[in-house]
């Protein structure tokens, strides 16, 4: 039996082929993650006598090209947790790490665990895209939180508590009422610099333009809040630019987050287990970030 140890890195892999009792079938050599080089590797491994199994570590996405190609070529591929391999054979006082030694170590690990090596099965396209989309969603959510905190920090000096003026939830497209409001009124003096009647009329026009419900009492509350706060940042073109740009960045992140959320919902709905999961108690759709 032959065990192929593959130490994977970005765009390339180190290959070593071992047999029991420490027999080196093929000394360690490097293979790029290109179709031509992987084809040559497949042919080389296919010409070996006896059963051949391939062992590699989970390394983010780096192992996927080699694992998928060799799986499609008909080889028994096993992708094992890196911690399991790390603790294997670590009795030496001198633990030098090289790609060649790691490839041999993986091959020996596969020989010692031959009967229990888990078989790698590639994910179908829908699940792969769903997982990838979710990772992007998580990254985008972190960016949105950072941008939202940045905008609130700016408003603390230009329009204190503006983010608390409205309790409306975010819309399906990711937009929020308070964010849209400060884009039009980036400074508290944009409100208290007007008379109560003029601001109310202007606020009503703004609500109609953006599709929000107008409430007379709410307009008066906003006016009272703006007039009751002291702004540190002066009302200048620079102050307006800072707030408007912060709003623009936050809107873009929120729109991206909403688009990714809708795509995840669409992908998940195509899975066969979706109706069963959605029928479970406590499970519901996520509408906001």
Predicted regions and their residues:
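A detector of single, family-specific signature residues
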Residues: 1-289
């Amino acid at each position: 039996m032959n065990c192929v140890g593959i130490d994977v890195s970005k765009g390339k892999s180190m290959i070593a082929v071992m047999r029991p009792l420490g027999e080196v079938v093929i000394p360690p050599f490097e293979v790029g993650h290109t179709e031509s080089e992987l084809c040559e590797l497949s042919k080389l491994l296919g010409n070996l006598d006896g059963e051949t199994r391939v062992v590699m570590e989970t390394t983010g996405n780096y192992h996927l090209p080699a694992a998928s190609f060799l799986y499609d070529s008909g080889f028994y591929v096993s992708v094992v947790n890196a911690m399991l391999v790390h603790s294997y054979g670590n009795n030496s006082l001198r633990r030098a790490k090289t790609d060649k030694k790691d490839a041999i170590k993986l091959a020996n690990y596969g020989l010692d665990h031959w009967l229990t090596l888990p078989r790698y099965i590639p994910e179908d396209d829908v699940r792969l895209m769903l997982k990838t989309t979710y990772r992007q969603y998580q990254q985008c959510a972190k960016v949105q939180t950072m941008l939202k905190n940045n905008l609130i920090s700016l408003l603390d000096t230009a329009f204190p508590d503006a983010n608390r003026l409205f309790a409306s939830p975010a819309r399906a497209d990711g937009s929020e009422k308070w964010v849209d409001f400060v884009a039009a009124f980036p400074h508290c003096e944009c409100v208290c610099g007007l008379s109560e009647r003029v601001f109310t009329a202007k606020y009503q026009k703004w609500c109609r333009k953006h599709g929000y419900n107008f409430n007379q009492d709410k307009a008066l509350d906003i006016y009272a809040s703006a007039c009751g706060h002291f702004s540190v940042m002066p009302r200048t073109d620079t102050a307006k630019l800072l707030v408007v740009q912060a709003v623009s960045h936050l809107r873009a992140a929120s729109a991206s987050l909403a688009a990714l959320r809708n795509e995840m919902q669409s992908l998940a709905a195509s899975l066969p287990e979706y109706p069963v999961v959605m029928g479970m108690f406590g499970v519901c759709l996520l509408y906001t970030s």
